[in-house]
């Protein structure tokens, strides 16, 4: 196994536009795999990454959504082999630690969330600049905006290759986060639960689709972009609120108007905007309401309205929608193949080559944009 020279998207400092340049990708070490990325996609978290989220470690190779094939495996890897189609992720699952066995969380203690170091689990990087040899941090330890990447084998999920690979890229973070939150976190009741989804991007549409699959009959979508109405309805949304069209009422007031003054059982906050968190919480029922936050932002803190909490509502943050990468993600792929999850192809609105990555960031601002597919 040799060092590979390939193209990747590198951000050299917070606030600087990313650039496509040649990097060096080392062979996998023990317990690791090297993946040839075929498709990647753009998530709002990647925008935040250019600003230093979740920690300002630069230079970094961007990207955390993608799908590819195993190019080679390191010593001790038995579950994967060359040619396997895989999704690289930022979570692991050992199946044996206290958290994995509890059934209450998807955050494995043995293979933890790789969000804060920018390095492999052993504390080093497999990527460096082809120009000056500088070490490059790996965003969320997977860096999918690179023709090749190296990750710990436990963070790579082998998937059924029958699924269209662009769709698999969409399932590697955003859509699955929303869908998983309805399935793994919310404990929705078929025919009785009411749901609101704040923000109808890929995460929000995943939550809408998940609520539909769970049998929810009232699914309220909330977005300031009217173009999202049609997309939300395609995934199962039953009501739509554009808060900008009724400036005299808050989001929670508008939600309660649609729920006989009660609010919803569960509100999924998919924007990461701190000012909307309290509105999402206040949109839920007193005593039993549950607000699940899925969005991310650059702010380090937020203020929660204590009065809303006095109503005995529950507030929880969810990473990857509570989905366990090895146990649950293959099941979501299967749900797509058997058409239990429908219309996932409608997430795709734009497509660019890796060399046009900065155009992808501009496309994300378009009112009709949901997912930008990146072809490598």
Curated annotation (Swiss-Prot):
May be a positive catalyzer of strictosidine production by assisting secologanin biosynthesis, thus being involved in monoterpene indole alkaloids accumulation. SUPFAM superfamilies: GroES-like, NAD(P)-binding Rossmann-fold domains. Its cofactor is Zn(2+). It is an enzyme of class 1 (oxidoreductase). The keyword NAD applies. Binds 2 Zn(2+) ions per subunit. Transmembrane segments: none annotated. One of its GO terms (biological process) is alkaloid metabolic process. GO terms for molecular function: S-(hydroxymethyl)glutathione dehydrogenase [NAD(P)+] activity; zinc ion binding. NAD(+) binds at residues 45, 199-204, 223, 228, 294-296, 320, 371. This is CYP enzymes assisting alcohol dehydrogenase. Belongs to the zinc-containing alcohol dehydrogenase family. Class-III subfamily. Zn(2+) 1 binds at residues 43, 45, 64, 173. Homodimer. Pfam families: ADH_N, ADH_zinc_N. GO terms for cellular component: cytosol. Its EC number is 1.1.1.-. CDD domains: liver_alcohol_DH_like (cd08277). Zn(2+) 2 binds at residues 94, 97, 100, 108. Pathway: Alkaloid biosynthesis. Promotes strictosidine production by assisting secologanin biosynthesis when expressed in a S.cerevisiae host optimized for the biosynthesis of monoterpene indole alkaloids. Keywords: Alkaloid metabolism, Metal-binding, NAD, Oxidoreductase, Zinc.
